[in-house]
Amino acid sequence: MVWEVKTNQMPNAVQKLLLVMDKRAPGMSDSLELLQCNENLPSSPGYNSCDEHMELDDLPELQAVQSDPTQSAIYQLSSDVSHQEYPRSSWSQNTSDIPENTHREDEVDWLTELANIATSPQSPLMQCSFYNRSSPVHIIATSKSLHSYARPPPVSSSSKSGPAFPHDHWKEETPVRHERANSESESGIFCMSSLSDDDDLGWCNSWPSTIWHCFLKGTRLCFHKESNKEWQDVEDFARAASCDNEEEIQMGTHKGYGSDGLKLLSHEESVSFGESVLKLTFDPGTVEDGLLTVECKLDHPFYVKNKGWSSFYPSLTVVQHGIPCCEIHIGDVCLPPGHPDAINFDDSGVFDTFKSYDFTPMDSSAVYVLSSMARQRRASLSCGGGPGTGQEFSGSEFSKSCGSPGSSQLSSSSLYAKAVKSHSSGTVSATSPNKCKRPMNAFMLFAKKYRVEYTQMYPGKDNRAISVILGDRWKKMKNEERRMYTLEAKALAEEQKRLNPDCWKRKRTNSGSQQH
């Protein structure tokens, strides 16, 4: 028995394939290579069989049917249905002689063919609106896309949305693009993207975009060579720099400023507009250009020459921007996007640590654990304590890639010293468990960040009074503002539990025994 396939035109519905008997004349030429169906099918439920052939029971299972050897088969599909061609020589005229295992294989082929039809671009199922929308999906970024901030702009591709402010040659600002969906397969760092984006737009939207040079939105600039030395927002400066004629005289001295990178000369933490900021001084490398002082956020990331991504507060940077960083030090050269020395981003050892771990944007704060392990290990070794077995996880690799322990630290290094002392207690507990301490909670992390600032604001108050003020501010904060500290505290707690599970049990046991 042979089946001819036709399609009924059904308005506003998916077209159904109806099986009808082939009544072609048996004398039709066999030389034509036709579309054929090489499967035996039972009668369709509720469909009257042809009188020329035997009627079959209305059963759900497929059964072998005796076919008339005088008839040939046609498998006809309308132009809007996907299909495949099979040579006529492969068609068996006597289907009853096909063994049972062959029928099973043909069943799979038949189901595959139906799946191909249903999922083809011409299928009405695939033409529904919910298949055409641009829905964000998780895709894995390659190691080369991790440093999209430092990648040179694409040469052959024409961007749909150009840079906000034009610059010259490779120095021009790099726009933020979506990561290509067909090139991600290696790294475990995840980002959000859309499959409908252009292949040429190969930038990940989870990385920050610079406004001018290597500075993000919200940074304030002060050029020492200017007579007035006024502070100006980086957005206003970049907007003025884009005016070729009007501001040519004023901005001429800053054209190409720091094109080979900005060398960090000094840094301090200060308060600006009621917010704790970093005040950094850079040297552009040329005497005629003069020095530059900037005020930026504590979590501002920088791409450092021969080092990779760096930050003064790696824990804050990874939570805020999703970028795992080394610690930046005096003497580091911060490069602008697209700099030739910034294209060798695969040499940045910091990302080698994360290649075998899958972190989604929701738990990106877990990467903080790895970034803090270098400080824990250095603090443990400097104090004379041996590194714990659990601490060998990846701290040594991270420490090697992020510089020597003797490098310069922040002016607020006392904060780090306290934090490291608390964090490194888990390492010391590998040899002396009684010294194990619980990690800091969200409020403690918040207080650690702002205690120096509030001490400077209220010089006459002692530490306890400062804690009360910090507590009042913490209560007034919104949940969105607390989230960063909550994620960081959660990551610390999970790592402490992993390294010292018995320490947590012992704490509860001791507290219970003291109550009795």
Curated annotation (Swiss-Prot):
Gene Ontology molecular-function annotations: DNA binding; RNA binding
Name of the protein described by the UniProt record: HMG box-containing protein 1
Any GO BP annotation: regulation of DNA-templated transcription
Keyword set, alphabetical order: DNA-binding, Nucleus, Repressor, Transcription, Transcription regulation, Ubl conjugation, Wnt signaling pathway
DNA-binding stretch(es), residue numbering of this chain: 436-504
Pfam family, any one: HMG_box
Start and end residues of each AXH domain: 203-345
Domain of life where this protein originates: Eukaryota
Compositionally biased spans, kind Low complexity: 156-165
Cysteine-cysteine disulfides: none
Major localization class: nucleus
InterPro entries on file: Ataxin_AXH_dom, Ataxin_AXH_dom_sf, HBP1, HMG_box_dom, HMG_box_dom_sf
Subunit annotation: Binds TCF4. Binds RB1. Binds the second PAH repeat of SIN3A.
Record note on what altering M373D does: Strongly reduces Sin3A binding
Function: Transcriptional repressor that binds to the promoter region of target genes. Plays a role in the regulation of the cell cycle and of the Wnt pathway. Binds preferentially to the sequence 5'-TTCATTCATTCA-3'. Binding to the histone H1.0 promoter is enhanced by interaction with RB1. Disrupts the interaction between DNA and TCF4.
